[in-house]
Each structure stands twice: as structure tokens, then as C-alpha cells.
């Protein structure tokens, strides 16, 4: 409270945490571990089951639009609305029905400006709190329209990642089986602890391996032990589900703007090899058969994540800890 006649207190933010209990943040302090691919797949798979879903691309590259096939179209605002919402309190206006039941708030070049704008507004502790809760404040206004909300976070941009954490309930961490990913896990674990000052209900839900060989079972078992050591928690934090390495599928997803399960549906349209050889094939575009297996990986992952979240929610409700 101030007694000055020429200044006034900024109104204290009122975050209704009950509205944000279905927000999932996909993050890791390291890039190249599958955050965007995972975010897009979980969001689209949930939507395909009939649940209204929102995907927020808090990333300056805007790759969610690329994966979903609407990059560089009139629907892709390159993050302009997200920038206005987070920095100026504008209403979030998602792109509707990018897939049936799936809305998207695109990222892109305007998102890159968010951190520099907000960094200049963190002079006091109260200012810092307001900045960190900027996404939570604008998201809570539309959160009730959706059953699930997924936030894709950027690598190596602590402020944007922390803004996402302050709007989320559950954190999902993809990682590869290398030391760089382990450091990224330790970094985001520290961020989660720090951001609980602003978001007391934030929790690490699960860790999973992305881009692993199907025969690398021993490596994944060792990774489970490493995750337990890094987090100081039980080794079941690492999910059984993992996403296999499939370079051809990753390339085709970007090339065609289709997710793995959508590519799978096109396999039956692949031309026969003898038709291609004879030059009689009507369709010369082929889709990797491996897309079927990758689609199954993501379906298993999404199911395990949602089951674990539901179990955690039920446990907290029983204990009187869920807002």
C-alpha cells in the first residue's frame, strides 16, 4: 500500500489455481530432446479422443505450426497473440480446430521478444511475481474451455520456461540417454522448486526417454537409476513408455505437416515397389512403415502420462491438497 497521491499499487494478481489443474508443461533445460514433437502428439492424441485440447507453443521457432501443417499460413501469427497476451494482458485467441477438438496458440518470432520485454519489468519482488504469473493470468480466462492444456517450452530461455512452469500443474520431461539431458533434467528440477514460490501446486509428474533404440533396454534401465539419483526420488519417475529413434519418420512429419499417427494412416496408400519401378504408380510418395511403430509409442506415452496424472490428482483430492 502506498500513501502517495501520484502513484498507486498495482492490483495483486488473483490466480484461481483450480482452473489450471489440467495444464501440462513439457520441458527440459536442454534442446533437441523432443519437447515440441511430444507436445504436439499428446495434444493431438487427446483431441482425437474427443476432448477439447489446447496446445500453447511458447517457443520462438514456432515448430508446432510446422508439425501440424499450418506454418506460414494466415492462421500462423508467429506468436503475435501470445506476445500481446503475456506482455500486455490481451486475451488469448487460439487458432481453432487445427485438428478436430485441437486449438493452438502458435509460437514464432514474436515469442522471442517476450523475455526482453518482461525482463525490464522485474525491478521489485512484486514485479517479478507479476511477470512470472503473466501466462497463468491470461490462461485462466480460457482454461475452462478445455479438458487438457499442453505448453511446449523453449530450450535455454529460463524466463519463458519459468513463465510456463508458473502456469502449469504437471511437468513432463523428455530426455535422451546422455549426460546433457541429465543436466537439463537437474536444471528443470531446480526451476520447479524455485517456481513453487509463485505456483504452489506445480509438480514433476514424469520423465521419459525420447529417441532411444528399441534394443537399448540396458541403457534405459541405467537411465532410470540415474534419474532416481538426480531427483532424489523413487525410480518410477521414469516412465516405461519411450519414443523410439526413427529419423525417417521425424523427417516426414515436418515435410508433410503430419503427426506419426496421421502418417500411419497413409501407409496403405504407398505405391507398390513394382509400380514405381515400371513407372505406372499413380502416387510416388511413400510413407515410412516405421510411422506405425512411432505412433504406437506416442499413444502409449500419452496414456501413461494421463493415467499417472489422474492417479496423482485423485491422491491429492483424498488428502485435501488439490485446489
What are these regions (language model features)?
Residues 1-323:
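P-loop NTP-binding core
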Amino acid at each position: 500500500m502506498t500513501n502517495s497521491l501520484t502513484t498507486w499499487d498495482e492490483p495483486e494478481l488473483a490466480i484461481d489455481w483450480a482452473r489450471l489443474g489440467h495444464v501440462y508443461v513439457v520441458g527440459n533445460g536442454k534442446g533437441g530432446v523432443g519437447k515440441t514433437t511430444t507436445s504436439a502428439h499428446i495434444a493431438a492424441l487427446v483431441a482425437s479422443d474427443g476432448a477439447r485440447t489446447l496446445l500453447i507453443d511458447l517457443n520462438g521457432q514456432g515448430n508446432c505450426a510446422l508439425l501440424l501443417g499450418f506454418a506460414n499460413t494466415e492462421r500462423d501469427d508467429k506468436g503475435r497473440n501470445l506476445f500481446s497476451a503475456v506482455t500486455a494482458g490481451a486475451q488469448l485467441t487460439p487458432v481453432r480446430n487445427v485438428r478436430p477438438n485441437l486449438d493452438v496458440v502458435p509460437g514464432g518470432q514474436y515469442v522471442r521478444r517476450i523475455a526482453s520485454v518482461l525482463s525490464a519489468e522485474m525491478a521489485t519482488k512484486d514485479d517479478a511475481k507479476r511477470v512470472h504469473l503473466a501466462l497463468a493470468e491470461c490462461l485462466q480466462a480460457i482454461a475452462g474451455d478445455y479438458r487438457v492444456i499442453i505448453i511446449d517450452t523453449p530450450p535455454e530461455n529460463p524466463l519463458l520456461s519459468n513463465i510456463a512452469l508458473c502456469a502449469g500443474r504437471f511437468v513432463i520431461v523428455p530426455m535422451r540417454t546422455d549426460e546433457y539431458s541429465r543436466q537439463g533434467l537437474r536444471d528443470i528440477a531446480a526451476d520447479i522448486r524455485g517456481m513453487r514460490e509463485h505456483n504452489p501446486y506445480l509438480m514433476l509428474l514424469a520423465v521419459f526417454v525420447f529417441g532411444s533404440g528399441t534394443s537399448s533396454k540396458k541403457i534405459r534401465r541405467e537411465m532410470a537409476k540415474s534419474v532416481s539419483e538426480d531427483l532424489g526420488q523413487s525410480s518410477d519417475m521414469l516412465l516405461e513408455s519411450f519414443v523410439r529413434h526413427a529419423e525417417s519418420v521425424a523427417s516426414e512429419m515436418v515435410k508433410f505437416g503430419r503427426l506419426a499417427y496421421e502418417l500411419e494412416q497413409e501407409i496403405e496408400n504407398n505405391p507398390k515397389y513394382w509400380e514405381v519401378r515400371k513407372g505406372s504408380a499413380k502416387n510416388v510418395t511413400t510413407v515410412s512403415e516405421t510411422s506405425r511403430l512411432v505412433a504406437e509409442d506416442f499413444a502409449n506415452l500419452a496414456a501413461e502420462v494421463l493415467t499417472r496424472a489422474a492417479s496423482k490428482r485423485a491422491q491429492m483430492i483424498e488428502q485435501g491438497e488439490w485446489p
